[in-house]
């Protein structure tokens, strides 16, 4: 009976620690304070991706993206991060695609922190591991097939 009580108490304590760890109020406040509203999210993301590539000298005709991970990733007090696969078509029809990490800033938009083109990932497949979480790296590798 005593053994059962100890196991029960450890299960309760473990569940409590898990709940506390997943309800970090600081992380929640950073996400709420920086991620654009659902109504503006997609428009801001497309706008800021287009600006990033335009600033690199690409005359943008269209930008499309796919989320590589749903929702924001919050680490410490940094801006919340999002991970997308992007397809950029220029005005002459050339396509550029790759993996992007973005930071959501002040609910007003996104800043691209890292871009890895499809060709750069193919030439150095481990390069993404320093920037993207392991589950996101797996999704990126799926895109390369």
Regions found by a protein language model. Give the residues of each.
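C-terminal motif of bacterial Sec signal peptides marking the signal peptidase cleavage site
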Residues: 20-22
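Low-complexity, intrinsically disordered terminal/linker segments enriched in charged
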Residues: 114-145
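Bacterial N-terminal signal peptides that target proteins for export
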Residues: 2-9
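Mature extracytoplasmic domains of secretory-pathway proteins
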Residues: 59-121
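Hydrophobic helical h-region of N-terminal Sec-dependent signal peptides
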Residues: 10-14, 18
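N-terminal export/targeting and maturation segments
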Residues: 24-83
């Amino acid at each position: 009976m005593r053994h059962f009580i100890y196991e029960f108490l450890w299960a309760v304590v473990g569940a409590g620690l898990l709940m506390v760890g997943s309800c970090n109020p600081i992380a929640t406040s950073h996400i709420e304070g920086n991620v654009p509203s659902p109504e503006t999210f997609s428009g801001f993301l497309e706008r800021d991706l287009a600006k990033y590539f335009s600033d690199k000298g690409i005359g943008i005709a269209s930008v499309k993206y796919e989320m590589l991970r749903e929702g924001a990733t919050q680490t410490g007090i940094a801006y919340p991060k999002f991970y997308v696969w992007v397809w950029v078509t220029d005005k002459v029809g050339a396509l550029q695609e790759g993996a992007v990490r973005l930071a959501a800033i002040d609910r007003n938009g996104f800043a691209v922190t890292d871009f890895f083109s499809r060709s750069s990932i193919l030439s150095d497949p481990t390069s993404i591991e320093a920037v993207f979480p392991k589950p996101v790296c797996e999704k990126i590798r799926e895109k390369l097939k």
